[in-house]
Amino acid sequence: MFIRTLDELAAAGRIKSLVNDTTRSARFLTAADGMGFSYNDNRVSKGSDAVLWYKHHWEANYIIAGRGEVTDLTTGQSWPLEPGVLYVVGPNDRHRFRVTEDEHHVSVFCPPLRGDERHDEDGGYAANGPGPQTDRRMFLKRADEIRAAGKGMVAANGQARTLRMLTKADDVGFGFSDVHFAAGAEATLWYKHHWEANHIISGTGEVTDLTTGQSWTLEPGVGYNVGPKDRHRVRAHTDIHLVSVFCPPLEGHELHDADGALAPSDPVPPGPEGY
């Protein structure tokens, strides 16, 4: 398992300024990590206005704070963006992303970004391996609607509440969940058949590698990443809110077994070099 922090990313030159310096993009995972996807933590200033078109990727954006609007430039349809909204765009979706209040979101790409890309004149990124071949169009999901429909789950053997917002059926190459641990929760987990990235949004806690005994502090802006070799324990000192990305994606109905694992769903990415 491995941990990423904003301080480490800054020291490594992995925090990029985009969209006329209105966006700070921290590249937490890249293609080199071998997890089947990449993700960024993005903070965007009020007034940012970008036309984007990811011809070679799927991108999912989960709004954590702030407000804005996304518009499908093919149909003209617009959707308001606010905390708890997840919108997904792909090769067919030339779109406009406009921010009306300082905004914070997590962005997941598949295929993964190398991490050094800049938007081209169409608002896209260069291909990095085979891209999706699809006729699907952009779509949105809302955490409050999923919760109101009774589709939330209790997971981690009773220690967490999760909304599985993207699953294998969405066919974007990864799964995405919104997860809450209550203060005092403790879970032993072991994803034998998956890679999982966890990005802390709020709260504090600790994650421990149960093979080596090494522990790391969990706090906002920390990402911890676990794979098939990483039996680990998560402890919540306060209420923790995080987002979780799985590859291969979950079917969506899985529950943790006695080892803290989830059933296999597809081939497992190799992970970082030397893993």
Regions found by a protein language model. Name each.
Residues 43-44, 54-70, 180, 191-207, ...:
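Short, conserved beta-strand element in jelly-roll/cupin
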Residues 75-92, 212-229:
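Short acidic-glycine-tyrosine-enriched beta hairpin
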Residues 60, 88, 102-118, 197, ...:
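A short hydrophobic beta-strand segment most commonly corresponding to one strand
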Residues 49-51, 66-72, 86-87, 186-188, ...:
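Short beta-strand segments in beta-sandwich/barrel cores
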